[in-house]
């Protein structure tokens, strides 16, 4: 239910698999039934879950609640690769000797790009504070297009 074929008017990407994580993220099922059900063999069964390599999560520090000083951690808790793909980075809050920031940090090489973090992110206007950029896509161009800026 998470993976769809790109529409025919999508240019080079027509009929290629894509994921709309905000609508339905990949759950990184241990047996990858999507790969087994794929009629063309376009989806391969990865050796391990983090090897799925669908993309990498990118955090917008300007809109992420944790970077604003609030304790959120929703993306961290939603991640099936918790403490591997997303970790919580503790650091002093700039200009504040009393409070700390508990900010999510994506470990690119361990992120499978499943999108559960994006699907569950409570920030939505204009876009989630964490989005999955598909493998091979330019992160800045992709997020600008998703946010309606390009």
Task: Give residue ranges: language-model regions.
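Iron-sulfur cluster-binding cysteine motifs and their immediate structural context
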Residues: 1-11, 30-50, 73-93, 116-135
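Ferredoxin-type iron-sulfur electron-transfer modules in oxidoreductases and energy-metabolism complexes
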Residues: 9-15, 20, 48-54, 61, ...
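Generic detector of bulky aromatic hydrophobic side chains
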Residues: 16, 37, 55-56, 112
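Short Fe-S-cluster ligation motifs
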Residues: 22-36, 61-76, 100-123, 144-150
């Amino acid at each position: 239910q998470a993976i769809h074929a790109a529409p025919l008017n999508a240019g080079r990407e027509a009929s290629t698999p894509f994921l709309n994580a905000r609508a339905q993220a990949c759950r990184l099922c241990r047996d990858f039934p999507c790969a087994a059900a794929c009629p063309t063999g376009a989806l391969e069964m990865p050796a391990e879950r983090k090897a799925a390599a669908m993309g990498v999560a990118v955090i917008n520090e300007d809109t992420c609640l944790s970077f604003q000083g609030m304790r959120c951690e929703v993306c961290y808790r939603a991640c099936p690769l918790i403490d591997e793909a997303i970790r919580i980075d503790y650091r002093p809050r700039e200009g504040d000797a009393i409070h700390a920031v508990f900010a999510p940090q994506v470990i690119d090489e361990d992120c499978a790009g499943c999108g559960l973090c994006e699907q569950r992110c409570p920030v939505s206007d204009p876009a989630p504070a964490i989005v999955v950029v598909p493998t091979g896509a330019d992160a800045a161009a992709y997020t600008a297009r998703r946010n309606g800026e390009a």
